[in-house]
Structures are given as structure tokens and as C-alpha cells.
Regions:
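Glycoside hydrolase catalytic-domain context in secreted enzymes
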Residues: 133-875
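Generic cytosolic/nucleocytoplasmic N-terminal low-complexity/intrinsically disordered segments
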Residues: 11, 19-20, 56, 110, ...
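Secreted, cysteine-rich disulfide-bonded mini-domains of extracellular proteins
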Residues: 14-133
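Generic detection of short hydrophobic beta-strand segments and adjacent strand-loop junctions
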Residues: 12-20, 147-148, 596
Length: 875
């Protein structure tokens, strides 16, 4: 079933046929030349994009000498074989000594009698020889950096066999858990054997008691108590209030405190994904803002990486996160999300890679490789990745979320449960360090969840399926407050639920009281052996990260928002923009004018004299010899506001932006318009209506003003109505309307062209803006009112009265949007790149009714979507 057919996601290209713009056609001389829409230049010929190898066409065409494998073209000689002993294998398999072997068949804690390489035998999940204890074998030989804060902790660096080790126990001898030459699970077993029950229970907790850092690096008393009295060693940090350098200093001090404790167990610091950012609209003023992290470099959402659909970019993103996290002292991320965004109302689709499970698998694999340092040193220089939310949170009933009781079910009316496992299997094959189960009950999936409990409490899901069938061998960590999300277990006492968590095969709990697990032990629900097994897997991850040798970082070197990182994220922001419409709203036939990119020299030669004249310039819609552009963005200017610098202002080669132009003999000047009334072109930035995954009893509609169908309070509509009104105001300026008193208000600018840019954190229903509205009038007697865009009767059924261009972004500063629409600062890699190569990683439905009728688990299945999965075109 994991081979279920993929949904279509085509790459689209279009030619630009403007007199003074020449793009060479695809041929042997121009192997990256232009082709018709829906085609791409492939080996000097134009071919249909859908015929090429991709995650959506697993048998597509590749260049000579390569074959289509797992959705990508690879050299046949590079596949797993005796001559390529580390080559790729099919999903669910890994290369062992040149042969593809099922991941789940390998020797591990999940399969204690599994397969080992060579002549080795699986002994209790560890490969070795029967006559030698595998936990006594020195498998690592390269000396790592060992750092001890001896002056404070009284823990010394000792020398054994000419090698350095950290005397974490302070006994002057080399204990097995201090010996970095041994397997990590063996070190963990030795350490666990020395710990008390309270120490073990504290280790099982992943909470936020370490705080968010302090300005001067001092450790608050409550943090000291968490480490010293509660024995907590796994902590989530919320960033935002401290600089990277302050965090590095603070966390060094936290590590130094931990080193002073009896076993010297370091603290493993984690964070949620923090590199993406969004656009929001103030529901009172209509003012817009972007909210990138001030601590790390801003990148587009993972959904934007899915739109770019380039594994190189996704690996670069993962590597950037790794380096920036490590520089601050973070060594674990609660990501990436391997969920499939098949339910478009879900509030978290922007944090997935899309709806195509094979594409999501590719991006998940590359992201994990970037996080975990694959190819550059592995976990000792990486951060532990956490695939979530197993076995998939994307099929939420009615688009709700299991953070809330009403959204406790994931449903599969289309029978696509196994489709949602494809990316998780890819993550397991890639060696992902941890997994976070979903809060949800997987409704009626009795084969996988016969207990009908939240995933982390289901032994069938966690042990039988995740570990034994899929081959996962890492640590199972809980989502926040797992014991409180007690769906179908409400009548079970909390200590017994804690026991059920361990019985299922889960290991660590998030933000739950340690006393619940201590009570489970004291009441006899769980044994010390149950606790030991969990703590061993938790500590194994920290040993793999190299923290027991050196958990410290250099604050002076914590150059997190470096120029290189900012530029890489900025380029990705631009590459993720998808162009979905680029033609005048009064288009007729197939010869509509494409007026993007905005350029003072673009014209159509109306009189065949090969000389541009006033009236022929494409972007001078008012024919007055000047192109006036109104930009309604975060900062409503074509020229940077020095009082509001963006992320790129301080980066060499960028500085303050200016998209105005003086003009020349063959080009018109471009100036800032004062508003809609005098603009040739208006660029409006809006945000799709926000979802919510807390406290709602129904899915939030995707339309900008559709009524919330539940009884709880959905505040998103106030913000989205502000954006709706801004679009209608532009329509009214162009087309006129009738006010509440019945007075006809004439158009103030009938030649206005409108570019709509939507921030895509959910697929907002834009059909009313694309097709246009049948009425722009105020409601009789209601001054200042606007027509409902969620009312199908108010929407034109054919296109012609809507916006002139439409594009979506997945996290972009104003400069990224303006670079795109003005076709400036085009990325130079890959060779021949053009803006607009990204395509939609999920469809944009046409109505709330179409969304309600689709199946939550099936990808891209709404009727007559406004834009299909894979839509997009180049400038």
C-alpha cells in the first residue's frame, strides 16, 4: 500500500511574447530554452513536464545514463550494489553491504534477533559475536573534543590508553558510560543502572522549566530546582526575548550546573521549528506585519520548500537550521512534520511539505539529513530530528486538530491511511532520531489502532507498527501535555494512563508532572525495568549527540543570523513564490496581455515601427508616460523606509531597496503612486484566513468571510475581512459601485491593474478575487458595508472582472515580493533559473462547500479547484 499512486503535480512554464523581450527557444544550442505552457526543455526538445521523473511520476523520463528512482534521476551505477555499498534503496529498505535490506529486518532494539552485517550476530538488539559482550567493544576510535568545567564542577578530564575522557561521575575512574568508544546504547544502559528512580523519572520529562534565557546568563532559582531537585535534563526553549549570544551564554551556564550533579548528565535543549514566518493583518487597523524570528534566519514555511520542490534547497534549509541551533546550544528540534496536508482546513498545513506523499517523503528525508549532519559528521555535529505527528495528523476530521477535544479524530473516508505513512517510512529509512506521536485517535483504523486511543498510548501503533513493521529504532517523545489529551481514556486514573504510555512503547513525556510516573511506579503499574527501557532510549540520543563529551558552545562564535544564512533564506523566500495568474482582467481569447514583470521598457508594437511610443508600454495603463505603482504591503513603499529596515538591509550587496526608476529614451519612469486612484498598478498583499488548533469545535472556513460553523469563538474572520475589504476597495476604484444610499459612485481609476499577493498558511478561497464579483455595492442602509465573498451568488462564474495577476508566498518580506514582480535580483542557481518555477504543493479549492465535500485523507480531491495541485508559471 505504500506504493499507492501519487497525485499529479506538474511543473508549468510559459513563454513571454513581448516585442522587446527575447527568450531563446529550446534546441540543441539552448538546452534550457523556452517551451510552451506545460512543457520543459529536456535534452534539446520540448516535452510534457508530466512525463519526466519526479516524486509524482515514479517511472518518468530521465537524461541519458540515469534512471528514475524514488522520484529522482540517479545514475544506475549509484544504486545500492556491491560497487555502491551505500547507494539508495526503495522505500522501506536500506543498503547493507551492497544489498537492499528491509529496514525493519535489521538488528536493533526493535528487532533483537534481526540481521547484522558480515558474520556478526544480533545479541539483544546489538550486533556482535557471541563470545564477546558487544557492550565491551570499542566501536569508535577518533578522539572527540572533551571539555569539563573542572573549577566549578570538580569533574576532570582523565586520560586512559592515551585518550581523553570526561570523569562525569567524579570517581577518578573510567566508567562505561564515560567511555565514548562504546556504543551509545551500551553507555546508556550503564548510566541507567546507576541512577535512582527519581533521577530516571526526571530524565523522562521534557518540559520548559529551563526557561528562555536571561540577559546576563544567570540561572533563576526555579531552573536550578528543575535540574537539581527534579533531575530534568530535556528542555524546550521558546526563543524571541534573547539574542543568540545571550542564549549561548545562558545554556553554557545551565550545562555547567548539570555537570556539577552526581552523574554529570548534560541538558539536551530543543525547540519547535522557528525558521519560518508569517504575514498577519491587524483586525482593527488593517495594518500588516511579518513576524520572522529575530533570533534565527527567516525561511519560507516548509510548504514553501514543497513549492520549490528542490531537494538541494531543502537540504540547505536543514543544514542552516542545524548550524544555527548548534551555535546557540540547541541540539534537538521537534520537527520536521512528515504529515500530509490532505485536509486543507487544518491550521498547520503550512508546516508540512504538501499533499503529495512522495514529494513530502523526499523533502522529509533531505530535511532530516540536513538536521542530523548526514555527510558532514553526523549527530555529533548535528541536531536530533523528530518526525511528527505519527502516524499522520493531516487527516483531521473537518479540519480541526486533536489539540482540542472536538478534533480528537483523524478520519479516513477515502481509505488512504497507508498513504499517510510514506513520509514517515522515508524518515525512518534516513535514521531519524526521534518520533512524536499524534494526540489523535485514528477513527475505525482497527488494524493499526485497535485500542482506539491516542497514538502514543497504542501498543499496536507504537510497538507493532512503528517499531516492528516500519523499523523505527529511536526515541519516542510525547507532544505537550500528552497525559491530559486522554481521548477514550477519560475514566482511567492518571497514573495508569502514564503506565499505558510506557506499555505502548513510548519513552518520554512532554510537560507532564513527573509525579504521575512516580505514582505509576509506586502503585505497581510499572516496574523499574519499564522505566529503564524508556530512559535508556532517551539517553542514547544524547550520547549520540556527543553531549556527554562537550555540551558547551562558543558564544562569541554564535553568528546565527549571518549574512550568508539570511541571504540563503531570502533567496528561498523568492523561489517559493508561485505565480498563478498574469493577464489583464478584461482578457479575451488566448492573447491576454501579461503585464508582469513590471518594467518600464516592456511594450507591444501596435504600429509595427519597432519603436516604443506612449500608449504601447504594457505597464503604463493610464498612458501618461509614467508607470505609477501603489504597493500595499507591510511597508507601503517602493523605496525602503530607513525607520523600518528589513532583514536584508544590513547584508552586503543589498542595503535599502528602491524599485523606482528614472526612465530613458526607451523606458518609462517608475514612481510610487499615492494610492489606488492614481496608480497604473496596485500590488495588494493579503493573508489567507488563519486556522486554529486550540479550542474550536469546527473547522475554520477557507473563505474570507464565511460564517464559522461551530459554537466556539473563531477570531480569524475579523482579520480576513480586513483583507477582503482591501481587495474590494481596489475593485471599487477600478469599476465603481453603489453606496448604501443608492448613489452610484463612479470608478476613480478604470485603467487600474491589480496584483494580488496572498500569504499562504492555508489555501484561502480566492475565486471571488480571481473571477470577480457580481456586485461591489454597499448594502442598502449600511454605510461602509461590503458584499460577502463567500456567497456564490456574488461571484462571477467566468473570469474577466477579477484581479489581473495573482501569486502566493509562503513567508516573504516585502523585498522578496517586489524582487519577484519587478524581476530583479534573480537567483543565479540553478543555471537558467527564472522567477515562478515553484508550483502549488496543494490545491486551492473554489468554495467552502467543495472543501466540506472532500475526503480528509485524500490528496487534492476537491471539485473544480480554482488552482490545481502543481499549478504555476514563470514570469
Amino acid at each position: 500500500m505504500l506504493g499507492m499512486a501519487a497525485c499529479a503535480q506538474d511543473t508549468k512554464t510559459e513563454t513571454i511574447t513581448v516585442t522587446n523581450e527575447v527568450f531563446p527557444a529550446c534546441d540543441a544550442t539552448h538546452p534550457t530554452g523556452q517551451c510552451d505552457a506545460g512543457q520543459i526543455c529536456f535534452e534539446a526538445e520540448c516535452v510534457d513536464s508530466a512525463t519526466l521523473c519526479s516524486p509524482t511520476n515514479l517511472t518518468g523520463a530521465c537524461t541519458a545514463g540515469t534512471i528514475c528512482f524514488a522520484g529522482g534521476c540517479v545514475l544506475e551505477t549509484a544504486l545500492c550494489s556491491p560497487t555502491a555499498p551505500t547507494g539508495p534503496c526503495e522505500l522501506g529498505s536500506v543498503c547493507v553491504e551492497g544489498m537492499c535490506v528491509a529496514t525493519a529486518s535489521l538488528c536493533s532494539s526493535s528487532n533483537p534477533t534481526g540481521t547484522c552485517a558480515g558474520d556478526l550476530t544480533c545479541i539483544d538488539g546489538i550486533c556482535g559475536t557471541p563470545e564477546v559482550d558487544p557492550c565491551s567493544v570499542h566501536v569508535y576510535t577518533t578522539q572527540p573534543t572533551v571539555v569539563a568545567k573542572t573549577a566549578t564542577s570538580q569533574k576532570a578530564v582523565i586520560t586512559v590508553d592515551g585518550l581523553q575522557f570526561k570523569d562525569l561521575s567524579g570517581d577518578g575512574a573510567l566508567d562505561p558510560y564515560e567511555d565514548w568508544r562504546l556504543l551509545e546504547i551500551c553507555r546508556a544502559k550503564d548510566l541507567v543502572s546507576k541512577m535512582s528512580i527519581p533521577e530516571k523519572v526526571g530524565t523522562m520529562s521534557e518540559g520548559s522549566r529551563v526557561g528562555s534565557g536571561t540577559e546576563d546568563g544567570t540561572i533563576p532559582d526555579n531552573v536550578t530546582a528543575a535540574i537539581v531537585e527534579k533531575f530534568e535534563r530535556y528542555a524546550l526553549i521558546r526563543t524571541g526575548s534573547r539574542t543568540p549570544q545571550q542564549l549561548a551564554v545562558y545554556l553554557n551556564n545551565v550545562q555547567e550546573l548539570a555537570e556539577t550533579q552526581p552523574w554529570g548528565i548534560p541538558v539536551t535543549i530543543t525547540a519547535d521549528p522557528i525558521h519560518g514566518f508569517g504575514l498577519s493583518t491587524n483586525n482593527n487597523t488593517g495594518e500588516q506585519s511579518v513576524n520572522p524570528s529575530s533570533v534565527v534566519s527567516p525561511w519560507p514555511y516548509p510548504l514553501g520548500l514543497g513549492a520549490i520542490n528542490d531537494p538541494v534547497v531543502t537540504r540547505q534549509y536543514g543544514d542552516t537550521v542545524r548550524r544555527e541551533f548548534r551555535a546557540m546550544g540547541f541540539t534537538w528540534q521537534l520537527g520536521p512534520m512528515a504529515d500530509i496536508a490532505t485536509e486543507p482546513r487544518w491550521a498547520r498545513v503550512q508546516n508540512t511539505f504538501g499533499v503529495n506523499a512522495y514529494a513530502v517523503a523526499m523533502h522529509t528525508r533531505e530535511c532530516i539529513a540536513g538536521f542530523q549532519g548526514t555527510g558532514v559528521g553526523g549527530l555529533p555535529v548535528g541536531i536530533a530530528a523528530t518526525m511528527k505527528h505519527f502516524p499522520g495528523a493531516g487527516a483531521d476530521e473537518d479540519g480541526m486538530d486533536s489539540h482540542s477535544y472536538s478534533g480528537r479524530y483523524n478520519v479516513y473516508p477515502g481509505g488512504y491511511f497507508e498513504y499517510h505513512q510514506i513520509a514517515f517510512q522515508a524518515a525512518i529509512d534516513a535514521g531519524v532520531a526521534a518520533v512524536m506521536p499524534c494526540y489523535s485517535i485514528f477513527k475505525d483504523q482497527f488494524e493499526y489502532d485497535p485500542e482506539q486511543l491516542a497514538a502514543g498510548f497504542s501498543a499496536t501503533l507504537i510497538t507493532d507498527y512503528l517499531k516492528e513493521e516500519m523499523g523505527f529504532t529511536g526515541m519516542v517523545t510525547g507532544d505537550w501535555g500528552t497525559l491530559g489529551h486522554k481521548y477514550n481514556a477519560e475514566s482511567i486514573p492518571t497514573p495508569l494512563r502514564a503506565a499505558m504510555w510506557l506499555w505502548a512503547g513510548s519513552h518520554q513525556f512532554g510537560s507532564d508532572r513527573e509525579s504521575n510516573f512516580q505514582d505509576a511506579y509506586d502503585l505497581g503499574y510499572i516496574t523499574e525495568a519499564d522505566i529503564d527501557g524508556a530512559v535508556e532510549k532517551i539517553l542514547e540520543m544524547s550520547f549520540k549527540l556527543g553531549l556527554f563529551e562537550n555540551p558547551y558552545v562558543d558564544p562569541a562564535a554564535a553568528d546565527v543570523r549571518s549574512a550568508a544564512n539570511l541571504e540563503a533564506g531570502f533567496i528561498a523566500q523568492k523561489k517559493a513564490i508561485v505565480l498563478l495568474a498574469n493577464a489583464a482582467h478584461e482578457q479575451s481569447g488566448n492573447q491576454a496581455t501579461k503585464f508582469l514583470p513590471i518594467d518600464g521598457s516592456r511594450y507591444k508594437d501596435a504600429n509595427d515601427d519597432s519603436t516604443p511610443q506612449v500608449g504601447e508600454y504594457l505597464d503604463d495603463t493610464n498612458n501618461d508616460g509614467t508607470i505609477k505603482v501603489w504597493f500595499d504591503g507591510v511597508v507601503d513603499r517602493l523605496v525602503a523606509d530607513p525607520e523600518k529596515p528589513d532583514d536584508m538591509t544590513s547584508v552586503a550587496g543589498y542595503g535599502e531597496y528602491d524599485y523606482t526608476a528614472a526612465g530613458s529614451a526607451t523606458s518609462l519612469p517608475i514612481v510610487q503612486a499615492t494610492g489606488l486612484a492614481d496608480a497604473d498598478i496596485a500590488i495588494l498583499r493579503i493573508s489567507a484566513r488563519k486556522g486554529s488548533y486550540f479550542g474550536l469545535d469546527a473547522g475554520v472556513p477557507l473563505s474570507f468571510d464565511g460564517a464559522f460553523p461551530g459554537q466556539s469563538n473563531d477570531g480569524s474572520i475579523r482579520n480576513s475581512i480586513q483583507d477582503r475589504n482591501r481587495v474590494i476597495d481596489a475593485f471599487r476604484a477600478r469599476d465603481g459601485y453603489t453606496d448604501a444610499a443608492g448613489t452610484a459612485i463612479a470608478a476613480t481609476n478604470p485603467n487600474l491593474r491589480i496584483v494580488l499577493v496572498m500569504h499562504f498558511d492555508r489555501p484561502g478561497i480566492v475565486k471571488p478575487f480571481i473571477n470577480g464579483l457580481t456586485t461591489l455595492d454597499e448594502l442598502p442602509g449600511e454605510a461602509g458595508s461590503y458584499p460577502l465573498v463567500s456567497d456564490e451568488a456574488n461571484i462571477e462564474q467566468g473570469r474577466g472582472k477579477g484581479v489581473d495577476a495573482f501569486l502566493v508566498e509562503f513567508g516573504a518580506i516585502d523585498r522578496a515580493v517586489l524582487d519577484f514582480v519587478f524581476n530583479q535580483n534573480v537567483p543565479t542557481s540553478p543555471e537558467g533559473y527564472r522567477y515562478g518555477e515553484a508550483v502549488l504543493p496543494m490545491e486551492i479549492p473554489s468554495s467552502d462547500a467543495a472543501v466540506e465535500a472532500q475526503f480528509e485523507d485524500v490528496p487534492a480531491d476537491t471539485v473544480n479547484p480554482t488552482y490545481k495541485l502543481g499549478s504555476g508559471s514563470t514570469l
